[in-house]
Structures are given as C-alpha cells and as structure tokens.
Amino acid sequence: MTLVMSPDSSYGRYDAPAPADNRIMSPVHKEREPELHIEFDGTTVLCRVCGDKASGFHYGVHSCEGCKGFFRRSIQQKIQYRPCTKNQQCSILRINRNRCQYCRLKKCIAVGMSRDAVRFGRVPKREKARILAAMQSSTTRAHEQAAAAELDDGPRLLARVVRAHLDTCEFTRDRVAAMRNGARDCPTYSQPTLACPLNPAPELQSEKEFSQRFAHVIRGVIDFAGLIPGFQLLTQDDKFTLLKSGLFDALFVRLICMFDAPLNSIICLNGQLMKRDSIQSGANARFLVDSTFKFAERMNSMNLTDAEIGLFCAIVLITPDRPGLRNVELVERMHSRLKSCLQTVIAQNRSDGPGFLRELMDTLPDLRTLSTLHTEKLVVFRTEHKELLRQQMWVEDEGALWADSGADDSARSPIGSVSSSESSETTGDCGTPLLAATLAGRRRLDSRGSVDEEALGVAHLAHNGLTVTPVRPPPRYRKLDSPTDSGIESGNEKHERIVGPESGCSSPRSSLEEHSDDRRPIAPADDMPVLKRVLQAPPLYDASSLMDEAYKPHKKFRAMRRDTWSEAEARPGRPTPSPQPPHHPHPASPAHPAHSPRPIRAPLSSTHSVLAKSLMEGPRMTPEQLKRTDIIQQYMRRGETGAPTEGCPLRAGGLLTCFRGASPAPQPVIALQVDVAETDAPQPLNLSKKSPSPSPPPPPPRSYMPPMLPA
C-alpha cells in the first residue's frame, strides 16, 4: 500500500490523501495528473488567480467568488500568513488553491487586485473628515510643488502665456489692422442699435443668435485661461470663481483694439463699421457708451504689443482678491509671477518701464467698473429683447388669425371677396415705439402701392357696368363662459371692428355710412359694467316676493308657524273687533291716539316673523310718559265706576270727557281726551289731595272693553 503525496508537497509534511481512485496504484500504472473539467465556449472569462470560471470584475481583475472572498478576508482582517517553504513558487490552481495561502495572496496582488478597493465597513464621521483633510492637504502640497516648479521658470512661463494668447485670440494687432483698413476702404455701416457694443442690430436677432455671435470669443478666453501655467492645479470651484469674475474683463481687453478713435466708430464682430452716434442711449446707456470709448482711447494710446496684452489678460484673470477663492496662496503666487513676467517684457520694449507698468495697472479699477456697467446693461437688453420678440410673435399671430378669418369670409361670400380683399388689413396697437413705427411704415408702403391697383379695378368694373359693394362681416362678440348665462349683455363685450383702408370698389352710399360710423362716438365698454347689467336685466321679483324671500325663516320653523296659525284660526270664541265709534282727538295730543286691534294676515306674519313681532310690541316710553299713562288709566277706572247711565257731563276742570253712546250694541267704547291748557306754561296735575269718591251706584251690566295699548 502506497501513499500518494502531492507533487508540490515537501518531505516531512503530511497532506490530505488523494482521491480513492488514485490512492492505491499498481506498480505497472503511473500516477495521473489532475484534470480540469471546465467548459470553455470562447466567451468564458477565467479567474486570473486560480483559473476557475470568473464571476465578475472584483477589486480590479476578473476573479471567481472564492478568490474574491479570500482576498477580501485577508485584507480586512489583516491576516499574516506563514511564509511558503517551497521558495514561494507554488502553483495556484482550482483544485489546490487552498493549500498555500501565502502564495495565493501573493498571486492575488501580483495579478492586480487592489488593496484600496476593499471596503473596511462604516467609518466614523470624524475619522472620515480627518482622512479627507489629510488627503486634500497632501494633494495640495503636491500641486504646490508642481506649480512652484512651473512658475519658477520665468522664461518658460512667459513663452507659454504668449503662445496661448496668440493661439486663442482672433484679434491680434495684425488681424485688427487688416480689418480696420478694410472697413475704412469699404465702409459698411450697421443700423442704429441698442447700447451693446460689438453687436449690430440686436433687435433683429434672437437671443440664441446673439449668444452664438460671442460664443467663439468667450471660448477663446476660457481656453487661454486653461493654458496658463498653474491654472489646472486649482480646484473646480476656484476655476469657476476666477472665470466668472474676470471673463468679461479679459474679453474687453482683447476687443479694445476694435475701437477706432479717429473715426469715432467701432468695428463689429461681423466686420461692419458702427458709428458712435448711431448707438441708442436708452436705459441710461449714454454714460456707458462715452465711458467705453474714452477707456478704449486711453488703452489704444499705450500701443500695447501682443505679448503685453496676453500677460495683462492673464493678470486680469488670475486675481487673488476675487470673493469665494479657497486656495488664495496659489493664486497670489501665480499673480506675482505673471506680474514679474509683464514687468520683464515692458522693461525690454520700453524705456520708461516702471512708470508704464504703474499706468497700466491703474486701469484695472476702471476696467472692473466698465465690466459691471456693461453686465447690467446686458441684463436690461436681454429683458427688453425678450419683450420685443414676444410682441413681434404676437403681431404675427394676430396677422395670421386675421388672414384666416378673411379667407373664411371670402369663401362664404364670392361677391365680397372681389371688393373686400383689399380692405382686409388690420391695424394693431403696439406696445413699443420701434415696433409701432415699423408697422406704420409698412402699412403706408402697402397703401401707396395699392392705390393704382384699386383705381384700375374700379375703372374695369365701371366699364363693364358692374357696381360692387363690399360685404362687411357682422361684428363679433365674445360671450363670457358662465354656467348661469341668461343671454343678457353685460356691457363688457368688445366689438371686433375691422378697420382698413378705404376700398375703391365701394359705392358713395356705403362710404358715407362708413364715415358716419367712424364719426359716431364709441362709449367705453368698461365703464360700470355691473350697473349696465343691472339696468338692462328685467325685474326678477316684485317687492312683496322679494321681502318674503328676504325674511324667509328656516324650513323647520315654517311648519311650526303653520301649525300655530291653524290652531289659532280653529280656536272657538275668538273675539272679533267691533266697529269703532267716531271720537274727537285733541290736536295737541298726537302721542296718545286711540288704539284698536290690528288685523294681521297670517301669511305675512308667518313669513315676516321679526317684522310682525316688532309691530306687535308697544313702543318704549319714558318714565314721564309711563306716569301720565298710569294717571289716565286711574281716571278711566273712576269714570267707569262713577258715571251715570245716560251720559257724563263735562267737568269744569275739563280733564276728562266721557261719551257713552246710546247704541243698542252691548259693547260700549270709551273715548278719552286730555285737555291741555293753551297757556304758555303747562300746569301740572295736583295729585296731593284726593277727592272723596261718591257712593258707588249699582254696578252696570259688564261689557267687553278692548285692551288699551299705550301710545
């Protein structure tokens, strides 16, 4: 019996036994090598470590799940394997990849698996912030070292900046001189434009065209900034801050040579020549135009070379005092190196080097001021331009609608199409003077051109014996979208009246009617529309119905009131008021008239509960009136008890007069009258002494007396 050892095992080390089929071998047969059974169809990717079928791209290489997990555990747990005893050259296969872990980890690293790609789990925020700060500081130090190496070489820095300016700028001295000579020889002046230099006739351009005209120029400034040594070492935020703040300044320095002071004009980007006086001064732009030409004349008088312009543009862009910068130290170093290069070039080309450099650097505040003013003007121009384009689109849409309506009318009326085709033009109110003037000029031109055609048409029709009158479409009304529309005009409808040039085919009568219609005053449609609607509407309710609706109680109280009135009507023995005998009220006592029960209709009191209650209540009286009423009632009771059967004689004092009629009706009525002295000073009643009451006579038969209501 023979033990088969692994081919890569060493002496003295016991390994696991081989499979059963290879464990006992006859002395005749030799030992077989292990076979790999992997189906390979031409698209299968194998593991770079063990040769097994790869499951994906893990930690930088194609590997299987076993090698991926082995490498992750080894790195995360920081396992130190025992060194290999076979010269660290073990063969790592699928069937024996677990035998030597040291060589397996070594092969994983050798084929390209990255230690940094392994995640270590959740990192605390403080630890993560510390790691990021350390990484940023190390990156910043590396950038500073590289920038120092680039900026310390002065001649190389100077050459790179000048070459970048010549490669990215289209307006060098030679090219601008050729453009200026061509513009002077064959001047092509642009139309009057808004106060936006270097851009002719912006009112005829869209915002997209205006942006495309400056796109390549702005792109040149951005490319120039990227070619400055040390600019690529800045962060994205610092790059954006520098370009946003200094882009227009550098662009203005590049285009300063386009201003021609002797001719008092400017060469536009399209090669046209624009006079200074042709620039409109709207929106307080005259100060901007004058300041721009003055600054351009000042800069052009210095006669800067291309190298000086390139270095000056770099200094304008790389400025350390821009708000929002993070790496200010690197920007300051770049600015100082660029300034020293400019000083070197000025010293080589000019005799007065320091004074000229000082004069050139003094222009930076004025340049920033002009840049700010120009940016504000561009914002205003953009707003006005959008409004102008919107108005133009509105006019075009209105024209298309009128054209469609005219075509429909002509299709309906073949006779009217002959005469009204010339009078289908409409007049529109424009919100801007420029647009109004343009449209007015266009109408005048069309009207002048159509006079001859109209005259020929009239002559031809008159020769043939035809009289054609224009067919005018009826006025159109715009009906309000209302769910309760009653068909009543509200007074807000606007008549869409077609106004056009007078047609040559119209008869004298129709022309007179048109003139009379034009002279007729048109009332404003928006003058008190609610009042007009109310006056035009017919009355919906009469007064009684309106009052019933206004004082209509809730539905649950209506049934209660109906029941109450039905019970009151059905109650037996209800007293009916008797006819009142004539009485003689005194003219000086209107506050105490004789009262009688008021018949109130059931439906009215039921529907007007509050009103009926207020009418049935007695009026509120002052204390003096209450006292007087009590005295009157006392005298009334005395009169009833002490009055004779036939009548009551009038007393000398005459305060009360009792009339008793001889009517056979059993219900006598007592009329009271208070005599008021006709003297100037009223005499009060003396109630201190009580007169002895007479002996009571036999009581008369009891009669009904209606209740007295106080006045």
UniProtKB/Swiss-Prot annotation:
PROSITE patterns: NR_LBD, NUCLEAR_REC_DBD_1, NUCLEAR_REC_DBD_2. This is Ecdysone-inducible protein E75. The keyword Nucleus applies. A zinc finger (NR C4-type) spans 47-67, 84-108. CDD domains: NR_DBD_REV_ERB. One of its GO terms (cellular component) is nucleus. Residues 574-590, 693-711 have a biased composition (Pro residues). Residues 591-602, 682-692 have a biased composition (Low complexity). Residues 511-521, 560-572 have a biased composition (Basic and acidic residues). Keywords: DNA-binding, Metal-binding, Nucleus, Receptor, Transcription, Transcription regulation, Zinc, Zinc-finger. Induction: Expression is induced by 20-OH-ecdysone which initiates and coordinates the molts. Residues 405-432, 466-530, 559-602, 680-711 are annotated as: Disordered. Orphan receptor possibly involved in the regulation of genes in the ecdysteroid cascade. It comes from Galleria mellonella. It is found in: Nucleus. GO terms for molecular function: nuclear receptor activity; RNA polymerase II cis-regulatory region sequence-specific DNA binding; zinc ion binding. Belongs to the nuclear hormone receptor family. NR1 subfamily.
